[in-house]
Amino acid sequence: MLIIGIAGGSGSGKTTVVKEITRQLSGKVVVIPQDSYYKDSSHLPPEERQKINFDHPDAIDFKLLCQQIGELRQGKTIEQPVYSYITCSRSATETITVEPAEVIIVEGILVFTCKELRDQMNIKIFVDADDDDRLMRIIVRDIEQRGRTVATAIDHYTETVKPMHLQFIEPSKRYADIVIPQGGHNKVAIDVIAATIERALHNQ
């Protein structure tokens, strides 16, 4: 089994990279998204939940994430939490059953900020992209998926996304074994990474 960490800023193309690697390694990959492991905030009033900074490492339940990655490594099945951005809370009744696989991809903007999690990874990949390109993708995503206007999306980027990127995400790039420039558009890099993973599996 290989544990692959894929990090990078919001809108960098991580999802595209993960999808392409998963496609090339058909049937061998399970993806564990960081976004499923935000801390449960159901005990907070709704107005307090809206103030949560999802781009800060403190928002992530790294203890549970590390525990479940360790369980997958041991060949155990896990019950992955289900988190709702709408209610800012973890489902009390629903989980996703995840079986072990040859390749476990742990994906998210903050996955390199936790040493305990990094230490479980065999390969660490950072997806890099131009700030302007990331901003455009973030605005489109926030409007289409999170109900924001252009103005509120830009405000969110300026007040939260960019400062957290500079403070936590960009510095975590130094932990990467591989940096993919041009984000999800870099087909050559993605092909090389998929081939490298295949070789590593073969050599285990």
Give the predicted meaning of each segment:
Residues 10:
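The conserved Walker
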Residues 30-31, 39, 43-87:
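Conserved nucleotide-sensing/catalytic segment adjacent to the nucleotide-binding pocket
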Residues 91-146:
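ATP-dependent NMP and nucleoside kinases share a basic, alpha-helical "lid"
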Residues 99-100, 140, 162-204:
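NTP-dependent small-molecule kinase module
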